[in-house]
Curated annotation (Swiss-Prot):
Keywords assigned: Cell inner membrane, Cell membrane, Membrane, Transmembrane, Transmembrane helix, Transport
Membrane topology: Multi-pass membrane protein
Superkingdom assignment: Bacteria
InterPro entries: Small_drug/metabolite_transptr, Small_multidrug_res, Spermidine_export_MdtI
Organism name: Salmonella arizonae (strain ATCC BAA-731 / CDC346-86 / RSK2980)
Subcellular location: Cell inner membrane
Primary location group: membrane
Molecular-function GO term, any one: antiporter activity
Functional note: Catalyzes the excretion of spermidine.
Gene for this chain: mdtI
Annotated signal peptide: none
Protein name: Spermidine export protein MdtI
Length: 109
């Protein structure tokens, strides 16, 4: 396992934020009917992958990708709730809990 450096953690945090932004912008694009939001969404995805590529220079790929995807899903869920009034049913909440437990287990491994 590589030694953790804060700069790589910062790159990972930026990648997560950009992924969330990309997902929210994609929703705002209304299926790319609103092209400006669609283009911004694509730019955010490219920037997120660029930041992730910097993060994996100092964080194991398996850990970085799991955290990126997991936190991205959880935060996008929260954004959907706050911005769009979207709600999960009980099965969805079980999935979120399993996701978070899995992320913790990967980080501890």
């Amino acid at each position: 396992m590589q030694q953790f450096e804060w700069v790589h953690g910062a790159w990972l945090a930026l990648a997560i934020i950009l992924e969330i932004a990309a997902n929210v912008l994609l929703k705002f694009s209304d299926g790319f009917r609103r092209k400006c939001y669609g283009i911004l969404s694509l730019a955010a995805v490219l920037a997120a992958f660029s930041a992730l590529s910097q993060a994996v220079k100092g964080i194991d790929l398996s850990v970085a990708y799991a955290l990126w995807g997991g936190f991205g899903i959880a935060a996008t869920l929260a954004a959907g709730w706050v911005l769009f009034g979207q709600r999960l049913n009980p099965k969805g909440w079980v999935g979120v809990v399993l996701l978070l437990v899995g992320m913790i287990m990967i980080k501890l491994a």
